[in-house]
Amino acid sequence: RIYHRTGFECGWRYGNVEKENSMKRRVVVTGLGAVTPVGNTVEEFWSSVREGKVGIGPITKFDTSEYKVKLAAEVKGFSAKERMDFKAAKRMEPFAQYAVAAAKEAFEDAKIDMSQENPYRAGVIVGSGIGSLQAVETNYEKILQKGPSRVNPLMVPLMISNMAAGNVSIQLGFKGKCTSVVTACASGTHCIGDGFRAIAYGDLDLCVAGGAESCICPSGVAGFTALTALSDSEDPEKASIPFDKDRNGFVLGEGAGIVMLEELEHAKKRGARIYAEVVGYGATGDAYHITSPAENGEGAGMAMKLAMEEAGAQPEQIDYINAHGTSTHHNDLYETRAIRYALGAAADQVVVNSTKSIIGHLLGAAGGVEFVTCVKSIQDGFIHQTMGTKETEEECSLDYAIGAPVEKEITYALTNSLGFGGHNASLLLKKYEG
């Protein structure tokens, strides 16, 4: 395979970075929302993370007796009618319900008063990698059993992935830019990155951004199993073990992670609490393979470099990386190479972990929840342990927070997402210092 020289090796940059940055507005995080396998609010989620609770267990959503894979990371005890208008919720599939619940939490956390806001300056960028496989399954069964005339008239709007963003917009009354990025497992991170850009360059003042997913269902589990992507371990403590020498696939998870992004001066004017600042975003394509990341890590590494370049941050300034870390053989090895490609010698000084060791792989929602994890880590000076991981292989040789969490002051945190098709996204957060 031929690998072309990268832009950094050739000595060029994407545009006039100094000029572009001088025109940008600063973007901060003022609200957090999450629905996860270890808690249905940010408070519940973060408490579980700090306690080292793992949200993986036997699949309860359908009979797995004929399935090789028995475990998943399901959302537990979620009640849509307690989180949103119940009539509206009945016209949403679970992924959209999770999105609305997390978005409302972020909105309320940010204490936005829409009577004081221009709704056309408030946007929604929320993605889902898949949308609803369940709606397809249910209605296909109706076609087989009762004929095509019995299909639910709402099948299409229930199924399509952009309805996460659509329903959030409807429920919050946000009338500005409303889009949905679909880049498989990088969807949530791309959405937050696009929200960051929309505010930085003046399209919006407020943006709820992130991802939502729910596809723990027969076709979802069967499809990923056929791809040999899922772990077939029946021990919840040993199923999702990123970077471990015995890893054998990811654990399918579900949920949503959505944040409120806001232009700094807008946030200060209304006296908002500021959690952190978003200072860099990098997005690249591997142009390599439909499921595997590039073996040399160049594409993902370049995304990290671009995020750092935008922020004017040096590799040695990065304190923490929340890795994509799926627990598949290829991803974890190639992402390790990507981190070394991006950070060089400084890679040996950074702490890396994988939240998927706790909540499994939330696909399009993963980046949103992992962004929330980075914000809370910066806030608390706490990097959670990569749960279950005991011993790494030779080339996976970074500090993966194995065996215990790490107490550390964090100024800069990177979060990575890699999606099928070669989609790479990295976001750089910074501790807010005024």
Where is each model-derived feature located?
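Acyl-CoA/ACP chain-elongation machinery
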Residues: 203-248, 281-295, 325-332, 349-399
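ACP-dependent fatty acid/polyketide chain-elongation machinery
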Residues: 18-88, 110, 265-277, 372-386, ...
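Active-site-proximal alpha-helical scaffold in enzymes
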Residues: 99-112, 161-165, 169-213, 251-272, ...
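Conserved beta-ketoacyl condensing-enzyme motif
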Residues: 29, 45-46, 50-183, 212-221, ...
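A glycine- and small-aliphatic-rich helix-loop capping segment at beta-alpha/alpha-beta transitions
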Residues: 43-48, 134-148, 198-201, 221-234, ...
